[in-house]
């Protein structure tokens, strides 16, 4: 048996004693949302790290990227923190996007910015009525826990909750986990990049 399967089996065995509601009950509620002040116009400049604001989801690009207009009318492109959803051209990519559209289209959300990515998108936790949307995508088999980033930056308690949610979805064969070994989006992107003529 490969070395990685033993810890995975232990985690799945431990999760057998966890109810889905136990994972959901560990969803954190964001601090009181505060409007971003002092920024002019409808700038698409990302909000500073640690910023909290409230806004309406105006579009869902894919299973981990949305556009939000905050309460002051400023537009934000937001990448959901610590998850990686299948790309649109990949198996389950459309399902992941459509799930996020169903739960977020035209919804008001609380945004907790953690970083800005290399594309200038805010990287953030999103909450809708107290529900951690990022975690919900993992829990429902619509995204992976993006551990290569999360293990360096995500708070340990959140990391453990997200890892447990992914293991549960995997054990239940939910969403993208219905397939035995689904191709992770970071590997899909690497394959696409390698296949492009130089």
PLM region spans:
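Small beta-barrel nucleic-acid-binding modules, primarily SNase/OB-fold domains
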Residues: 1-198
């Amino acid at each position: 048996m490969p070395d990685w399967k033993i810890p995975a089996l232990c985690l799945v065995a431990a999760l057998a004693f966890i109810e889905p509601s136990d994972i959901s009950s560990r969803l954190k509620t964001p601090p009181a949302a505060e409007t971003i002040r002092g920024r002019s116009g409808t700038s698409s400049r990302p909000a500073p790290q640690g910023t909290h604001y409230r806004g309406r989801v105006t579009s869902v690009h894919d299973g981990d990227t949305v556009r939000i207009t905050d309460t002051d009318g400023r537009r934000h492109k937001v990448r959901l923190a610590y998850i990686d959803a299948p790309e649109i051209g990949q198996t389950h990519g459309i399902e992941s996007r459509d799930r996020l559209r169903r739960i977020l289209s035209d919804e008001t959300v609380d945004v907790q910015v953690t970083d800005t990515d290399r594309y200038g998108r805010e990287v953030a936790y999103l909450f809708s009525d107290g529900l951690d949307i990022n975690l919900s995508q993992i829990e429902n088999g619509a995204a992976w826990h993006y551990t290569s980033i999360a293990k360096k930056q995500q708070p340990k308690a959140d990391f453990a909750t997200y890892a447990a949610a992914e293991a549960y979805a995997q054990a239940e064969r939910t969403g993208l986990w219905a397939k035995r070994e689904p191709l992770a989006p970071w590997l899909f992107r690497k394959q696409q990049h390698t296949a492009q003529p130089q």
